Amino acid sequence: MKHSAEQPPIEQSPAEQLPVKQPSAEQPSAEQPSESTRERNMLKTLRNRWPLIVLVAISTLSIGLVVALLKTTDAFTTADQSAERREIEAIQSAERSTVLGLVNLPEAERAATLLPIAQGAAGLERDRARYMLATDYINQGNSEQALPLLDGLADSYQPLSSYVLLKQAQAQAALDQRPAAIKTWNQLTRSYPESAATAEALYQLGLPPVAKESSTAGPVADPSAWAALLERFPAHPLSIQVAFRQLDNLQPAADEGATALPLLRNIAYYGLEHPQYLQALNRLVDQYGSALTPEDWAAVGFGYWETQNYAEAGDAYAKATGTPTSQYRAARGKERGGKRKEAIAYYKQLNLTFPTAPETANGLLNLADLQPNEEAIATLDNLITRFPDSAGEALAKRAEILDALKSPDSAKQARASILSQHSDSAAAAKIRFRQAEANAAASNYGAAISWAKQLVDAAPNDELAAEAGFWLGRWTLKQNQPDAARQAFEQVIINHPESYYAWRSAIYLDWNVGNFDTVRAFQPEIELPSRRTLLPTGSEALQELYLLGHNQTAWNQWQNEFITPQTPTVGQQFTDGVLRLGVGDNLEGLFMVSSLAWRESPEEIAEYEAIKNQPSFWQALYPFPFPELILGWAQERALNPLLVTALVRQESRFQADIRSVVGAVGLMQVMPATGEWISDQIGQTDYTLDQPADNVKFGTWYLDFTHREYDNNSLFAVASYNAGPGAVAQWIAEKDFTNADEFVEQIPYPETKGYVESVFGGYWNYLRLYDPAIAAKINAL
C-alpha cells in the first residue's frame, strides 16, 4: 500500500546471487533477485546425494523414486542399499506417527491425545509423545509436570538424548532447583560433548542467575564454560551472543586487541544473523584489518555482500584468496561503489586468472557495460567465442551497441544470429515475444501466433514461455481455433503451473477458480498439511526436532551444523530456507527457497528439480504464517482468504516488522497516513501498525474499501491497494482496453503491473496447492 512506482531492480550476477540477507525492501520479492536473472547462481556445490533422496521420497507413493535415483548414480553399492533402506524406514516411520500428526495443533488441543501415548508401550512413539508433552508443559509454566515425563527418557530416545537432558535442566531451573540444573547441564556436557544441546548447557553454566533476566553483565558462574562454548561451538547463536557480550565488557587495556580480534573474527564468520553484525564487521576492518588473513577477508567480503554493502564487499574481496567468485565480486563491488577504473581492472584480471570460469562470462558482460562502444564490441566478440551459453545475451548487447553506433544492418544481423544460432536462449525468447506482441497489436494474429509458437517450442522453460503460451491461446481464439487455444492454455498449466498465466489460462478453460470480477466472493476449500516431511539434509537430531515442530531448537541445531553458508548445497539451502520460515525469518526464508532456481550446473539443476517436484517445496514457497489472524479477518471482511494471504505475501513476505523505504508498515504495508484515515472510519484510535493484529485489521478494511470502490472487481481493487484509487480511476478513464488482460498489460506503473501479476499469481499458487479439487484438475492434465 505504497502508491508509488518502485525503483527498477539492480542487476545482479550469479556470483552475486548467493542467498542474500534482505533486511527490508520497498517491495520485497522472493521470486526475483535484487539484480538481473541473466547471471545465474554459480555456487560451488558439494554433492549431498543421500539427504536429497530423503526429501524426494516424502510419501509412500514416491518411495520407489529413491531406488530409481540411486540407480542413476555412478556407484549403487551395498552400503547405498543399506542407506536407502534406512531412509525409507525413516520416511515410513514419520508418515505413520500419530504424534507427528499433532504438530500443527495448539498445545492445549493435543494434550489429550499425547497423554495416553506417553503412558503407553515403550517405543519411538512413546518417546516422542513424552518429549512433546514435556516441552508443552514447560512452555505453559508447568515444569513440575514435565520432569516425570523426562525422567529416564534420555536412555531410550536416542535421536534427542542430549535435548532430553537440556529440557530436564530447563525444568529444574524454572522450579528454582539450580543445583540440580547445574548437575544436569554438567552431565550433558560430559555425555554429549559434540551435541548442539551442549552449547546451550555451556551458555547456562557460564551465566550467573542474577544476569539471566538482565542485559547487565555480571561475574560468570564458570568462566571456562563460555570459553569452551566459543572454542567448540563457534557458529552457535549463543556463541555469537557471548562474543558480543564480552566485547561490550572489555576494559581498555594494552592487550585489548588480543581479546577483541578473535571475538570479532568469530562474529565475522558466523554472526550474520545478529542485529549488530555490521557494526562488528566495520570495527574488525577499521581496527584490525592489518591482522586479517586472505581467508578472513573472504568472510568479511561475504558479510558485507550479504548485508548489501557492495562497495565495502568489493574492497574486502580484493584482499581475499583468489577464486572466481572473490575476483568477480571484487570487480562488481568496485563497480557498484562507483570505482569504474578499478572495476575494469579487476574484470580484466578475472578474465586472465580464470579464463574458463562461469563467473568470467558474467564479468565480461559487465565489463562491456563499462567500456566505450568499440572496446565493448571486442569484449563481447571474445565472450561469444569462448562462452557459448552466454552468447545469446552477448549478441543482444552487441546489437544494442550497433544500434547506438548507427549500424542498423549489423544490429539486425546480430539479432538474426541469436535466432538461428542460439534459438533456446533468453535473448531469442525476448526477440520472439516482442515480434509476437508487435504483430498482435497490428491485428496480424497469424504472424503473432507463429512467433509465439516459435518461442514456446524453442525455449519452453524460459520465463516468457508462460506469457507467450497464454497469449498464443488468446490469439488462436481470435482466429476461431478453439482446440488449438485449449491445447495452448493446458500446456501453460502443465509447463508453468506456478505462473500467473496458468491462472489466466485456467479461466479460459472455464475452471472454477475465480476471475477478476468473481474472485472476492469465491470461497475455496482449503486443506492444509497435517504433518511435516523430512528435510533434505541435516543430522538425525535436526530431523527429529523439525518433525516435532520445535522450530527454535531446530534452528539453533542447524546453525551449529551449517558452517558453510558461503557455499551451500542445494539441499542445505532448501533446509536453511525452511528452518528460517519456522522461526519467523520469512523474508529471508522465502528468498532462500525461491533462489534455488538460479542454480546452473547440471547436477544442481537435477537436485533442484527433484526438490521442486515435491509438495514441500511449494508449501515452503507459499506458506501460511499467521493463519488464524489472516483467515479470520478475511472472513470478517467477506474476502477470499487466499487472495488476502497472497496479498500479504507480496506486501511483506509475512515479515511483521518490515518497513518500506517510504514508510509503509507491517504485514499489509499500511502507510501511517492511511492508518490514521482508517482509524477515523472504523472508530479505533488505539492501534499500533507494527502489531500484526492491528495491521491486518486495517489492511483488510482497506482492501475491502478498494473492492467497494470498484464494484468488487478485484483487479482494480488490488491495483488500487498498490497505486492508489486515484491512479487506477485515471487509468480506467484513459486506457483503451476491451478486457481485463489488456488492462493489465497497459498499466503504466511497472511496479503496479508486476504487483497485480504477483498477487494473483500468488493467489493461484495457494489455490492449486491447498484446494484439493484444483490440484486434482491440474494432475489430470
Language-model region placement:
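N-terminal leader/linker segments that initiate helical-solenoid repeat arrays
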Residues: 48-52, 60-135, 139-141, 147-148, ...
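TPR repeat positional signature
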Residues: 95, 130, 165, 202, ...
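Residue at a conserved register position within TPR or TPR-like alpha-solenoid repeats
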Residues: 102, 137, 172, 209, ...
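Residue-level detector of the short coil/turn that links helix A to helix B
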Residues: 106, 141, 176, 213, ...
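Short solvent-exposed coil/turn linkers within tandem alpha-helical repeat scaffolds
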Residues: 117-126, 140, 153-162, 188-200, ...
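Catalytic glycan-binding domains that act on GlcNAc-containing polysaccharides
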Residues: 382, 396, 405, 438, ...
